[in-house]
Amino acid sequence: MKNIYNLFRIASRIRSQRLKLLGIYFLHMTRQRYLGVFIDPILACNFRCRMCYFSDGEKRKTLKGSLAFQDIEAISKSLYHRALKLQIGCGAEPTLYKDLYKVVALGKQYKVPYISLTTNGNILTYESLYKLVATGLDELTLS
């Protein structure tokens, strides 16, 4: 995964938006992977951290629901073949999603080279960690 971070480093040094767009166009035309897909399969959290928007009762009322697995399959069909990285959990708690293992497996099915999960880790067990890694998780970030 060192190559992914090298690409990110190179892209951050390029100042010209036109040159970046040309690079993306080149990657697209040569059928390379260039997207970072960030997904929150569920809008819920089991913590109420002060710095987080889930601690605000009014805001939390608007943050409800989860994606049906069929919706995630539709997203994956459209984007995963171009994804360089799949980030699961961008602000909510992905371990509350009942089909989390299927989401990771779906990323591997589409050969996404790097799959990362960000979680507070509260409900993770040894068995769930083992299953996530066995399904194809590359990185686990505890926040």
PLM-predicted stretches and their roles:
Residues 2-140:
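Conserved alpha-helical substructure of the radical SAM core
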Residues 143:
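A short, structured active-site edge motif that brings together acidic residues
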